Amino acid sequence: MKKMMIATLAAASVLLAVANQAXAGATLDAVQKKGFVQCGISDGLPGFSYADADGKFSGIDVDICRGVAAAVFGDDTKVKYTPLTAKERFTALQSGEVDLLSRNTTWTSSRDAGMGMAFTGVTYYDGIGFLTHDKAGLKSAKELDGATVCIQAGTDTELNVADYFKANNMKYTPVTFDRSDESAKALESGRCDTLASDQSQLYALRIKLSNPAEWIVLPEVISKEPLGPVVRRGDDEWFSIVRWTLFAMLNAEEMGINSQNVDEKAANPATPDMAHLLGKEGDYGKDLKLDNKWAYNIIKQVGNYSEIFERNVGSESPLKIKRGQNNLWNNGGIQYAPPVR
């Protein structure tokens, strides 16, 4: 009996190992076979993923998708986008409808450990705040006792707002909507006293209101909201490719490499780490099953982290959000990437 149990356990272990091997690399193989990355994004958030009048998508989350395509194919245009609501996003990833979720999604323990998904990094450090009309005369979120609060359903915001009001002995009435645009319209129409969401999303929604200057973001940040790309758990190869796409952008900024000077830097790398990153020394692309110019292609076609931040949400964008904690570690922020070596 004991021998039979051992044999059964051994057989199960072999089957599990085979299954894991089958899953490893499956996404990259499928992506290369179909010729593009299918990327899940938001259903319309300026600065992160937003379509213009011609249907062209732009934003930080979109640029991560483009970066992955540049790494895999050497062509950042080989990506297709699937706009998803907060309720739809995880099912779309779990079912295989999308290869990657790059959709202003907060990294939490339950999502990372309990839903069969893995977060590859943090593209934007954020926190939940409140948007309200300046005529209300509010100076602090602690003045919101009794307020009606617009919230997007299926987001981390619902729980965080409940916790904040409870901790401060305040009452509120939540009004939920499936889409962020719907919650913004409800706020503008007077249905809600305030709108709660990630602060970056509040700035993005504010510019879509009729008179943006009349609306203010209250100073309190009531939670930690690290936003980043998500992949299915179990495919370490694909996980690494998506993770190192962001790391390449961060390393490039730290080394002073951007889309305009990358050819000059590649021709004469100043340090061994720069030579490794740009594919001039070593065989580091092999570890990712990619060409050694994978990072060069990301930087050349999409840019470094500073470039994607500033053009989408920073000084070159209508949002004018300051880098803050999204600065590099050596410039007062907490963004940091391991070296390519």
From Swiss-Prot:
SMART domains for the chain: PBPb (SM00062)
Tell me which positions the record assigns to the signal sequence: 1-19
Gene of this entry: yhdW
BP GO annotations: amino acid transport; peptide transport
What UniProt keywords apply to this chain's record, in alphabetical order? Answer: Amino-acid transport, Periplasm, Signal, Transport
Q: What is this protein called?
A: Putative amino-acid ABC transporter-binding protein YhdW
Known function: Probably part of the binding-protein-dependent transport system YdhWXYZ for an amino acid.
Fetch the InterPro entries from UniProt: Bact_solute-bind_prot3, SBP_3_CS, Solute-binding_3/MltF_N
Q: Which organism is this protein's natural source?
A: Escherichia coli (strain K12)
Q: Which GO terms describe its cellular component?
A: ATP-binding cassette (ABC) transporter complex, substrate-binding subunit-containing; membrane; outer membrane-bounded periplasmic space
Name the protein family: Belongs to the bacterial solute-binding protein 3 family.
Q: Which PROSITE patterns match?
A: SBP_BACTERIAL_3
Localization of this protein: Periplasm
**Primary localization class, coarse:** periplasm
Which superkingdom?
Bacteria
